[in-house]
Regions:
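Short, P/G- and charge-enriched loop/turn segments at secondary-structure junctions
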Residues: 1-4, 137-139
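Structural core segment of the AMP-binding/adenylate-forming
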Residues: 53, 81-165
Length: 165
């Protein structure tokens, strides 16, 4: 029996929206505007960067950042490559973050350096002290054996993390 609806992924939906309404506004943030075509371009660029890091379908990627365009780029890019988004509440602190990373078996953590008074980077260093002496992509934290990558949006993240650029 044929399906009565077409099965689509979130990544496919973005591609279709960009094809149908390429010039229409898809996203606004802090006075900036992105059309569907521009959003798709950013998402595809982000997906290619993730693939270059070695991310693949099934990888769990913890996303711990406030609302901003990069959150959306990341979400759709991960959907396109088949990775699993592990959203983390931005009100969580060190012990909560550690629990989510451990429970989810995340291979990658994506976050910001800081947002307002909250220093996310300091909390990452607190639970992953080896980050400062690691090479990007070669993180080894006993508590989080699957975690290999930390990607930081904002200030220079230090030796062991990738910088979002």
């Amino acid at each position: 029996m044929p399906d009565w609806y077409a099965k689509k992924t979130l990544g496919t939906l973005l591609d279709e929206a960009a094809g149908r309404w390429s010039a229409r506004e898809a996203l606004t943030f802090a006075g900036q505007r992105w059309s569907f075509a521009q959003l798709r371009t950013e998402v595809d660029r982000t997906a290619r960067a993730f693939i270059a890091l070695g991310m693949q379908a099934g990888d769990r990627v913890a996303l711990w950042m406030p609302n901003r365009p990069e959150w959306l780029y990341t979400f759709f890019a991960l959907a396109k490559i088949g990775a699993v988004v592990v959203p983390i509440n931005t009100r969580f602190r060190t012990s909560d973050l550690a629990y989510v990373l451990w429970q989810s078996d995340a291979t990658t953590l994506m976050t910001v350096d800081r947002s307002g008074p909250v220093d996310y980077l300091a909390m990452v260093h607190e639970i992953c002290p080896s980050l400062a002496s690691s090479r990007p992509g070669h993180l080894h934290v006993e508590q989080f054996p699957q975690l290999r990558h930390v990607v930081i949006l904002g200030a220079h993240p230090g030796a062991g993390a990738h910088h979002w650029d």
